[in-house]
Amino acid sequence: MDRRTAIGLGLAAAVARPALADTLVVGDGVLPGDPKENILLWPGLPPGGEGLSLPPIRVHNHEPPFLTPTDRAIDRIGLPVMNVFRPDKPDGSAMIIAPGGGYSREMLDFEGMDVARRFNGAGITCFVLRYRLPGEGWANRQHVPLQDAQRAMRLVRGNAARYGLDEAHIGFMGFSAGGHLAASIATCFDDNVYKAVDAFDQVDARPSFSVPMYPVITLGEGAHVGSRNNLLGPNPSKELVDFYSLQTRVLADTPPTFIAVAADDTVVLPLPNALAYYTALQVSRVPSEIHLFEAGGHGFGLARTVGRPTAAWPDMLLRWGASHGFFKNAVL
């Protein structure tokens, strides 16, 4: 099925909110291992895509050492989608999950689908976000990931009844550059970064809770240079750098936040990133918790935690979420 024949989003005539069509799949956007249910983010051309023609989505292995046979990275994302992972026993909560990859690719499995399946086991409905990459030709590249994150939050919350969700229990998790996106939607949820395309865009985009994992936070001193350049371009203005240095964007309405990071992370340094963000959360009195593991490196996700203290982070998150009333099946 090509894009022209894909089923789009429709507005329900007799209800206050729009409803999703039954199936949202597109030919080159469906990959092996995708669940049966996939939500196309935009009903037409995504913002900033005028005149852009991307080749089909590219799937390749992560660099060695390979972790699993399905340790995939993807790029050339012209059609942003959410893969829907429904639990057998839903508890009414949900998480949108944004894989990392330095804003140049996305680690589809160990920071995406594997994570979704893990939290399905706790009753959480998960949506793995395949967001557009800013350096692939989109206009206003700096806002492209945030556009998709805002739209994803609005689609999930706008269809809470369809998925059996509590609108107040919908969070956003991200890893590395995806952690930057998680912090972006937590602090910039009401920034006007695209023109409304339908009634979903009137829905609140603020996450109920935020989970930036070993996140990129600052784009100034101490930044992960690759993520900064891929998001903002090679010579960004100070205004842009400040806008997306998210430790400066925290306010009292930033949602409750759980952070996990390893002290020996030499890729995205904890001090100017995760720890600076946690400090800003504390200054603004945002309910927040950070776990600074002695060892674990960068990008531990799920696959690199076996036999290590970092293996505890999913249960720590579940207990934290339960303490705030977001998750019902976690044991405190």
Q: Residues of each region from the PLM?
A:
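N-terminal secretory signal peptides and thylakoid transit peptides that target proteins
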Residues: 1-14
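Mobile cap/lid helix-loop segments that gate and shape the active-site cleft of serine hydrolases
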Residues: 60-69, 199, 215-249, 255, ...
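Short beta-strand element of the alpha/beta-hydrolase
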Residues: 92-100
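Catalytic nucleophile-loop/oxyanion-hole region of alpha/beta-hydrolase
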Residues: 107-115, 131-166, 306-310
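Primarily recognizes the serine-hydrolase "nucleophile elbow" in alpha/beta-hydrolase
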Residues: 154-224, 241
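Short beta-strand/loop motif that positions the catalytic acidic residue
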Residues: 259-261
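Conserved alpha/beta-hydrolase "acid-adjacent" motif
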Residues: 267-273
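C-terminal catalytic histidine-bearing segment of alpha/beta-hydrolase fold enzymes
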Residues: 275-332
